[in-house]
Regions:
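HIT superfamily nucleotide-processing domains
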Residues: 1-95
């Protein structure tokens, strides 16, 4: 389900959620990984993620925003995207 759209990005619920709130924020243009995108693109994705977090009521308790990059970073989809996770306490280290 789409939860937010801009001219440059789309945010939708993850099909295999790892938290009560798990939203992917994806640029409309293709970038294989974070290293391939500009500061403006990455900043916009994080900004959209924070807007979704507010929409989902996560501001008071907190949330996590993460982008997996490369094999060791756990990237399995080679199109830049950020994960917004919230609705439960996050652990560190994550994995």
């Amino acid at each position: 389900r789409i939860v937010r759209e801009t001219n440059d990005a789309i945010a939708f619920e993850d099909i295999a959620p790892q938290a009560p709130v798990h939203v992917l924020v994806v640029p409309r243009s293709h970038f294989p990984a974070a290293r391939d995108a500009s500061e403006q693109v990455i900043g916009h994705l994080v900004h959209v993620a924070t807007q979704v977090a507010t929409d989902k009521g996560l501001d008071n308790r907190g949330y996590r925003i993460v982008a997996n990059t490369g094999d060791d970073g756990g990237q399995t989809v080679h199109h830049l995207h950020v994960h917004l996770l919230g609705g439960r306490a996050m652990k560190w280290p994550p994995g």
